[in-house]
Each structure stands twice: as structure tokens, then as C-alpha cells.
Amino acid sequence: MKVIKGLMAGLFFLLLCACGGQQIKDPLNYEVEPFTFQNQDGKNVSLESLKGEVWLADFIFTNCETICPPMTAHMTELQKKLKAENIDVRIVSFSVDPENDKPKQLKKFAANYPLSFDNWDFLTGYSQSDIEAFALKSFKAIVKKPEGEDQVIHQSSFYLVGPNGKVLKDYNGVENTPYDDIIADVKTASTLK
């Protein structure tokens, strides 16, 4: 009888360990560099202010003629789905055209979507070279504004950033956006320290 009780206790312990050890599968672990930028209301948002929070990021610009509208529509849908499940997550959209995307312009752009600013910041307040370097170093994302052009080349991914400021995953933000996978990963990331 003691052997059975011992086996049951051991099995129970293993089950508890397995349930508490959720991990992000194949995390990217890119370190986001410290930043302090302005949001659509002219308020500062920094990596420090996001510390301890799970957040989603993308790169957009308001004059975009191709991928930014569907990306913003998909992020809006994701925001709605996360809210419906009472999942607390911040969303950060970095402008890749800071010369043209001042806070007022970002707010006007966002008004085209049924989104909430409660947990979503559209950021600007840096130079073109700064955002190009920041995107590459922090997200391994290409951002490039060709000379004399009004369109900017940039990644179309959504990025999941953990509470430790590391990029954990990236997802397609334009087509077949994997909402369920993102939501599951956000839930898992919320348990990480």
C-alpha cells in the first residue's frame, strides 16, 4: 500500500510540474533595445514602461499603400479577440516613416479602424535612421526608405514580446494571421518571468 501511495504522490508531483512549465515553442529571444518614443497623444512610451508586460509589436506607416492597412485591420481584430478573452496585452505599432508620421497623423490613421487606444500605442519621435537600426537590432526586421520615395520597405510581421523585453515569436500580419496561435502564445508568455 505504501508503494502505491508513493507512486500516486510521485505521479501527482510530475503532473503539477508539467502543468506549470509551459514554454513558448522555439522562442526567438531577440533582446529589444531600450527606447523612449512618443505615442499618438504625444506621451512617452519606453521599454522600461513596458517592463513586466506582454506586448505585441508591428511596423507600419500612415501613407502606406500596400500592407499596412491589412496589418492594422488584423491587429485590430486580434485586439478584439484578446479583449473578449480578458487577456491583458499591450500593442505597440512603430512608425517606419517618422518624418511624416507625427502623433496627430498617427491618431488620424488609427481612427480609420475600430480599435481602442486603451492598450495600443502608435509610436514616432525618432529619425529614419534610428527606426531602421532599432528594427534591425531589436526585431531582426528590415526597414528601409528609398531615397526620394514616399513608400517604406518594411517587414509585415507581428512580434510577441515577453515581460522580460525579449522578442519571443513572429507571425504573419498580412495573410492568414494565426489569431489562435498568437492568443495561446500570449497566454503562455504571461506566465513567464
Indicate where each model-derived feature is located.
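Short loop/turn microsegments at loop-to-beta-strand junctions
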Residues: 32-33, 54-55, 155-157
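C-terminal motif of bacterial Sec signal peptides marking the signal peptidase cleavage site
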Residues: 14-18
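Structural microenvironment flanking redox-active thiols in thiol-disulfide oxidoreductases
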Residues: 73-134
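Structural micro-motif
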Residues: 120, 132, 139-144, 153-159
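Short active-site neighborhood of thiol/selenol oxidoreductases, capturing the structured segment around
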Residues: 46-69, 75, 92
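N-terminal "domain-start" segment that seeds a small globular fold
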Residues: 21-48, 73
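Bacterial N-terminal signal peptides that target proteins for export
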Residues: 1-8
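Thiol-/selenol-based redox modules, centered on thioredoxin-like
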Residues: 146-193
